Amino acid sequence: DLGAVIYLLLWGRQLFALYSSNDVTDISDDRFPKPPEIANGYVEHLFRYQRKNYYRLRTEGDGVYTLNDKKQWINKAVGDKLPECEAVCGKPKNPANPVQRILGGHLDAKGSFPWQAKMVSRHNLTTGATLINEQWLLTTAKNLFLSHSENATAKDSAPTLTLYVGKKQLVEIEKVVLHPNYHQVDIGLIKLKQKVLVNERVMPICLPSKNYAEVGRVGYVSGWGQSNNFKLTDHLKYVMLPVADQDQCIRHYEGSTVPEKKTPKSPVGVQPILNEHTFCAGMSKYQEDTCYGDAGSAFAVHDLEEDTWYAAGILSFDKSCAVAEYGVYVKVTSIHVWVQKTIAEN
């Protein structure tokens, strides 16, 4: 006695099931024939969960479920617990090419940075944000308070921001969460109202479990910031930059001035946040840095062994294009625990 039979059809990307009894005459649709029996054997009814492109199955089992005598679908390893599909991170279809340079030292990003988001304030100021999973993005705390008073709260900020992912795909913001020490750690999180569909144009970047911000390591920073003629760019671009020596970066900002802005001492008239939670990238005589509008973008590092892209940092400070040679980034390893905790609690 074979018991009840579940006939399955994978139609497009949806899984459909038809229920029937043992009697093959009960099957009215010949697209679902009853499996033929064999001598000295039996038919085992099972199905397998598959993942869509740009997702992976998260399960301790193999995704295969069989029908037991209690008419329950059971996996040998996890029982009736179902697998989950989670988005792939850090696997762009068209990774950055370090050879194809364009005017101004920046590079044209053709789907190379699918984690890059564009955020626009209520006064039309453009900044960056970085997708880290299907529903959350990292950006700077300063970005979240653009055009707001000192007394503004995170709740005040969220409704005034417009956010785009991929190619101008508008997404709605549910809430923003500031780092508890955002005056020293210039970071905030954005939660979307709905999860985004991950594809070749929209994909999160991975968060690292180790420090990739080693002096001399080259990373890639993308954004819609100003070019070196101080015009906002229409297309996403990127630049390659090495991690700089922190002490040299600190001396640069402490000892440099411009004639019209001598206080505080800094090449751009304001002092960046430099502490154990930050690192610098760029070179002292290099004119191909990121520019105003890129804050919130990731310092993306390619791990060649894993063939995976990680966010080593989030750009916090770089407002001058050709004046300040170093950009300042918040280390993602410094905020990783807070990020995971905040996402879990929200």
From Swiss-Prot:
Its main location: secreted. It is found in: Secreted. The keyword Secreted applies. One of its GO terms (molecular function) is hemoglobin binding. Residues 1-16 form the signal peptide. Disulfide bonds join C249-C280, C291-C321. Residues 32-85 form the Sushi domain. Residues 102-344 form the Peptidase S1 domain. One of its GO terms (cellular component) is blood microparticle. Keywords: Disulfide bond, Hemoglobin-binding, Secreted, Serine protease homolog, Signal, Sushi. InterPro entries: Haptoglobin, Peptidase_S1_PA, Peptidase_S1_PA_chymotrypsin, Peptidase_S1A, Trypsin_dom. GO terms for biological process: zymogen activation. Transmembrane segments: none annotated. It comes from the Eukaryota. Primate-specific plasma protein associated with apolipoprotein L-I (apoL-I)-containing high-density lipoprotein (HDL). Binds hemoglobin with high affinity and may contribute to the clearance of cell-free hemoglobin to allow hepatic recycling of heme iron. Belongs to the peptidase S1 family. The uncleaved signal sequence interacts with HDL fluid lipids and mediates incorporation into the HDL particle. This is Haptoglobin-related protein.
